[in-house]
């Protein structure tokens, strides 16, 4: 028993002088582990007479409990001290001013779409929307685009089946509007459109804004004046605008609209390919067949339509030379438009 008391005193002394949790664990293993000092003493009970074993066993258990209790107390003390030290090192000064977070901003394409809508809403146009998954009739047939037209080819259009597709323009919204209401009609139709194309200036998904006006006595002069005023309001410049004859199945006559290069002011540069002009949209008078298929009398009503790519206008307005930058989600690029 003297050896037992000495072991306990030795163990308690070691526990008191330990300053590390890992060292404390080593002490526990040394005295209470499977091969520990006190465990070995317990194994000697078999050498004692049977009548002495209960008494000696009880004393050994009391000794083990003393050491274990001391270990638990010291472990709690060491863990508390370590926590206090860490908290002191990581102390937060609540009197310091908060760290501000940079505010977000609208995407440049969203800004462009909103700007276009605002320009036309000021002159009485309403915003109309429609489905992005369209049927062949509204995307092609109702717009006077026959079955042999190249726009129906698989390399230009994303088809789901023979009748359903991703719209290639927002013109179907114009058709649905003419089917659901009678003139006068003044709408702009912003939205996503899809075509099989991808390079520096084209994307398989892009945003388009188309406009439609149908009323009595509408002429090409009305179309020309509307587009000229819109472009000058959008770019906030007195731009030179020109109309070039073109062809679209859903308008007759049709035209492409060019503006004086906003980069070089018409002097010629890489952006305008030294021509001094930039193509920005297509337009024309609504074809009588389109009006007729929407149950609008072309003898009584006339209309004009126009369409533009939002990314194209955003590139010109903000001086961006690669369309794909709008879709890369690079915060270094997008942060410039806050």
Curated annotation (Swiss-Prot):
Molecular function (Gene Ontology), one example: ATP binding
One Pfam entry name: Phe_tRNA-synt_N
EC number: 6.1.1.20
Gene Ontology BP, a term: phenylalanyl-tRNA aminoacylation
Reaction catalysed by this enzyme: tRNA(Phe) + L-phenylalanine + ATP = L-phenylalanyl-tRNA(Phe) + AMP + diphosphate + H(+)
Protein's cellular compartments: Cytoplasm
UniProt GO cellular component terms: cytoplasm
NCBIfam families the UniProt entry points to: pheS
PANTHER family in the record: PHENYLALANINE--TRNA LIGASE, MITOCHONDRIAL (PTHR11538:SF41), PHENYLALANYL-TRNA SYNTHETASE (PTHR11538)
Protein name: Phenylalanine--tRNA ligase alpha subunit
Organism, scientific name: Pseudomonas paraeruginosa (strain DSM 24068 / PA7) (Pseudomonas aeruginosa (strain PA7))
Gene, per the UniProt record: pheS
């Amino acid at each position: 028993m003297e050896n037992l008391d000495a072991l306990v005193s030795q163990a308690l002394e070691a526990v008191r002088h330990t300053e590390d949790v890992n060292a404390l664990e080593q002490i526990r293993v040394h005295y209470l582990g499977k091969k520990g000092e006190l465990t070995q003493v317990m194994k000697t009970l078999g050498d004692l007479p049977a009548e002495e074993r209960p008494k000696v066993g009880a004393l050994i258990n009391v000794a083990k409990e003393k050491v274990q209790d001391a270990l638990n107390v010291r472990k709690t003390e060491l863990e508390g001290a370590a926590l206090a030290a860490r908290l002191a090192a990581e102390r937060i000064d609540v009197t310091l001013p908060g760290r501000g977070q940079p505010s977000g901003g609208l995407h440049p394409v969203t800004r462009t779409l909103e700007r276009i809508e605002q320009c036309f809403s000021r002159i009485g146009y309403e915003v109309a929307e429609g489905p992005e998954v369209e049927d062949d009739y509204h995307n092609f047939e109702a717009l006077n685009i026959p079955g042999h037209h190249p726009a129906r080819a698989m390399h230009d259009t994303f088809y789901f089946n023979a009748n359903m597709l991703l719209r290639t323009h927002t013109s179907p919204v114009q058709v649905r509007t003419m089917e659901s209401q009678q003139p006068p009609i003044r709408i702009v139709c912003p939205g996503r459109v899809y075509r099989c194309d991808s390079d520096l200036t084209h994307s398989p998904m892009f945003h388009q804004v188309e406009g439609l006006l149908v009323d009595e006595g509408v002429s090409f002069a009305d179309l020309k004046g509307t587009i000229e005023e819109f472009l000058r309001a959008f770019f906030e410049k007195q731009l030179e605008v020109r109309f070039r004859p073109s062809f679209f199945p859903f308008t007759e006559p049709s035209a492409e609209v060019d503006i004086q290069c906003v980069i070089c002011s018409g002097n010629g540069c890489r952006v305008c390919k030294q021509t001094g002009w930039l193509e920005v949209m297509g337009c024309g008078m609504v074809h009588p067949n389109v009006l007729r298929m929407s149950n609008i009398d072309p003898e009584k009503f006339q209309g004009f339509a126009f369409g533009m790519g939002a990314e194209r206008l955003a590139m010109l307005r903000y001086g961006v030379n690669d369309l794909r930058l709008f879709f890369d989600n690079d915060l270094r690029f997008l942060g410039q438009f806050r």
